[in-house]
């Protein structure tokens, strides 16, 4: 059971430069996917992608969009590393909008805190031991602080700093953090979700907005809400988009991760965020699409979303 909400609107940027990009390069459109437990409601986009002889959601007719998937690679290349006995931070590819963390400790509850240039703190669980995991740098260019926190009291939710490192980050492409796979949006070129996204994008889609529409409609029509799973989500839960696709069910986090993986592999920058709407914990996504189109006709709902952790 779930309540699905699709809402498009303009996202404010933090700098004059980004506002210029917003006006000149792309339109920032937000897609909120809220999934609650009380009602079964699907707010669908009428019409899906453009069919033969019809205009696309962008209102333009031309050559179909290339549906070929593109999966950007992440790598701990070892060119720039920091760390101690517990952790290795590979910062070789900060220009691509990510760092990689290899935790080698035994603490049962570990977190990674990424402080962006504007002081916003983004906190992610660390559950991979003995291997690298990818974490995004979502705050643009500037000075970041990466901090590893280990639990000292699970009952009291207390943590101690085990490692911290300052990084000067200059991201080559501002959209890069939202195109690469990472800890929460985990996929490869061989993932089933990537193949499915490619198939959906090949169904008479003429624009990025058509692809968003097609994938969104597929997800809300074919994935059902797993109430039992929602009641027993463990600490550090990581969505598996292929598993969600195979089982046809999941929680809001699964919906958002599946759609994010499909869209990123279609070269559409997509940000997954987790946070609270009132007392309800949920996940939603935002994506960048090319300008010139008209957002799908959807039922408008108030934006009650508070700050979230993007990935």
PLM regions with names:
Residues 4, 8-13, 17-209, 295-302:
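N-terminal accessory/pre-domain segments preceding catalytic cores
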Residues 60-64, 73, 231-233, 243-250:
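A broad, low-specificity signal for short, low-complexity segments enriched in glycine/proline
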Residues 123, 247-250, 273-276:
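Alpha-helix capping and helix-loop boundary segments enriched in small/acidic/polar residues
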Residues 144, 159, 178, 216-218, ...:
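Aromatic side chains
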Residues 179-247, 295, 307:
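Secondary-structure boundary elements
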Residues 211-215, 247-263:
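Active-site nucleophilic cysteine motif
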């Amino acid at each position: 059971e779930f309540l699905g909400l699709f809402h498009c609107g303009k996202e404010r940027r933090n700098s004059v430069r980004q506002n210029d990009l917003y006006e000149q390069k792309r339109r920032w459109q937000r897609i909120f996917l809220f999934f609650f437990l009380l009602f079964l409601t699907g707010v669908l986009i009428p019409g899906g992608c453009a069919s033969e002889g019809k205009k696309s959601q962008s209102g333009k007719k031309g050559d179909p969009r290339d549906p070929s998937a593109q999966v950007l690679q992440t790598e701990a290349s070892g060119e720039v590393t920091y760390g101690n006995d517990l952790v290795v931070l590979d910062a070789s590819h900060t220009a691509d909008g990510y760092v990689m963390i290899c935790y080698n400790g035994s603490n049962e509850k570990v977190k990674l805190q990424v402080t962006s240039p504007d002081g916003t703190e983004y906190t992610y669980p660390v559950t991979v031991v003995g291997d690298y995991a990818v974490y995004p740098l979502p705050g643009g260019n500037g000075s970041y602080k990466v901090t590893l926190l280990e639990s000292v009291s699970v009952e009291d939710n207390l943590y101690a700093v085990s490692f911290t490192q300052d990084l000067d980050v200059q991201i080559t492409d501002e959209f890069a953090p939202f195109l690469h796979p990472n800890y929460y949006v985990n996929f490869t070129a061989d993932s089933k979700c990537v193949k499915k996204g490619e198939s959906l994008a090949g169904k008479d889609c003429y624009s990025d907005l058509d692809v968003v529409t097609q994938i969104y409609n597929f997800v809300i029509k074919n994935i059902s809400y797993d109430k039992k799973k929602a009641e027993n989500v463990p600490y550090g839960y990581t969505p598996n988009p292929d598993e969600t696709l195979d089982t046809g069910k999941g929680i809001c986090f699964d919906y958002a991760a599946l759609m994010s993986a499909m869209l990123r592999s279609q070269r559409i920058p997509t940000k997954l965020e987790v946070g609270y709407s009132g007392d309800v914990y949920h996940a939603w996504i935002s994506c960048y699409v090319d300008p010139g189109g008209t957002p799908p006709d959807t039922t408008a709902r108030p934006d009650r979303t508070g700050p979230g952790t993007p990935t």
